[in-house]
Amino acid sequence: MTGFKTLWAMAGLLLAAQALAQAPIRNVGVFSLLGDSVQVTASTDAPRDTRIERTARETLEFKDIGFDIIGGRVARKAIETRQPPTLFRLFRAPVPLTLDDQVLIADGAARGELPEWMVRSIVTHQFTHVLLITRARGRASIRTSDGDAIGRGTVEGIGFYLDTLYTMRNQTNGTLSNGLIAPYVEMRVSLMDTDSAKVVAEHRLSEAYALAAKDGSVVADPWNFLSAAEKVHALRQLVEKTLTRGIVAVLP
């Protein structure tokens, strides 16, 4: 991905008169770059084999699933609660961004570098702060109803982790089912002070929980443990809950 600019280089004239100390959050640009894609990671090795990562990955587009809208809504509520009165504006990526693109942008922000389209928006709207919401990559750590943490390899962004071999107990009726589906999120929230072009707070977010087949039903493919509507609801709910925690964590 190209087109990065050092924030000082483009915005220096505008921001030079402002104090270098971290400014109050008066005018914030929220850049939620999550997009609508859903990553499906399927484990293909034995449940206790952690020596080698054997996973298959597939990316699906869930049109209008609204992760960025959720990000904006959560950010507005958190900022208005913690930092009133504050001007607020939400931006989404002009084109879909891959996970690697988003990691590159978040890493660049830590060096005071952002894509040109973001810098132009910062200058135009004279933001005192940027709140950046991106996908991340992390190790699979899936919470089960028994309190265990399972999973092998890595998971990316927002999606579902599938395991066809792990045995899960249904907490409603005690029946056992083979396999699990786990909604998960791996995200990164960064708060950037435009005066200093520095990230002043950052929080990594990792959350996942395992679900068994409903009511002990026999379903060969864990992907079918949830309907399409249930999958959308599970991810939206998890993104909102996790982002709420992350955004509150980076606000002063």
Model-identified regions with their sequence ranges:
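N-terminal signal peptide c-region/cleavage motif recognized by signal peptidases
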Residues: 16-18
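N-terminal segment of the mature soluble domain
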Residues: 44-171, 184-188, 192-202
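C-terminal/domain-edge helix-coil "capping" segments
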Residues: 22-42, 141, 146-252
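Residues embedded in well-ordered secondary-structure elements
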Residues: 8-10, 122, 178-180
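Bacterial N-terminal signal peptides that target proteins for export
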Residues: 1-9
